[in-house]
Amino acid sequence: MNINPLIYFSSSSSNSHRFVQKLEIPAFRIPINQSDSPLNITSPYILLTPSYGGGSTKGAVPPQVIRFLNIAENRAFIRGVIAAGNTNFGEAYGIAGRIISEKCRIPLLYRFELLGTEEDVQRVRQGIQRFWQHDSLENM
């Protein structure tokens, strides 16, 4: 089965990076530093992002993700979002995913806490496979 790459952001703490590595699927990381070359996407993808801001909507989406999505071509190819968050923030748990979902009019596919569990890894891996299988069947 052909799976489109996962696009993700992970800060220098690398929590999201470690989660993505466990998925064992093709993935590209959005650069941390503004001085790095931007990531330009030319095919459909799912975005995985952490949520920032300590429970506030202000600053919830990492600025690197905002810059990435402000590139029209990158925004055009987004098909879904997965969010990492902290359940201590209650209603704001994984809020970056909800914000991106609403602004880009795409589904929020999954939320997981902090580093995620093995169950989260399995659910995300299987969910991504089903998502792309369904997408490819619709485009036949």
From Swiss-Prot:
GO terms for molecular function: FMN binding. Pfam families: Flavodoxin_NdrI. InterPro entries: Flavoprotein-like_sf, RNR_Ib_NrdI_bac, RNR_NrdI. It comes from the Bacteria. GO terms for biological process: protein modification process. Probably involved in ribonucleotide reductase function. Belongs to the NrdI family. This is Protein NrdI. It comes from Photorhabdus laumondii subsp. laumondii (strain DSM 15139 / CIP 105565 / TT01) (Photorhabdus luminescens subsp. laumondii). The lineage of its organism: Bacteria, Pseudomonadati, Pseudomonadota, Gammaproteobacteria, Enterobacterales. The gene is nrdI.
